[in-house]
Amino acid sequence: MTEYQASERRGCRIMGISRSLLHYCPNTARDIPVVEVLQKLAHQYPAYGFGLMFNKLRQSGLPWNVKRVYRVYRLLKLNFRRKGKKRLPNRHPQPLAIPLKMNHCWSVDFMSDALPDGRRFRLFNVVEILTGKHWQLKLT
């Protein structure tokens, strides 16, 4: 700015930046303990996200600000994306086979019910598929 004989205020206004940004000096030495603790936690609990790691920091009594810890967390590239749900391939179900003759295919099932007095009973049900005829109902 001294080359163009312009004031600091005018130069910052022309460039569209604030004057405090011009004089800002980041203090990265304060972040070293945060980095060490986060790396240790990430190694110890690899599946933990930011929230659980920050809770661990709070439980151990460390007084660091959420915004500062999250900034360091992102700088360490610990913010990985969660895996989404595994998509199953499209299925092409085969139509059910129709039996060609009687007694070729049977279906078995357990059925359960309750009597009006509250007693429960189960039935073993066997059905012939082609005719729908019940072979035998057996009380179990």
From Swiss-Prot:
Keywords: Plasmid
Highest taxon of the lineage: Bacteria
Native source organism of the sequence: Yersinia pseudotuberculosis serotype I (strain IP32953)
Gene name, Swiss-Prot/TrEMBL: lcrT
PANTHER family recorded: INTEGRASE CORE DOMAIN PROTEIN, LOW CALCIUM RESPONSE LOCUS PROTEIN T
Name assigned to this protein: Low calcium response locus protein T
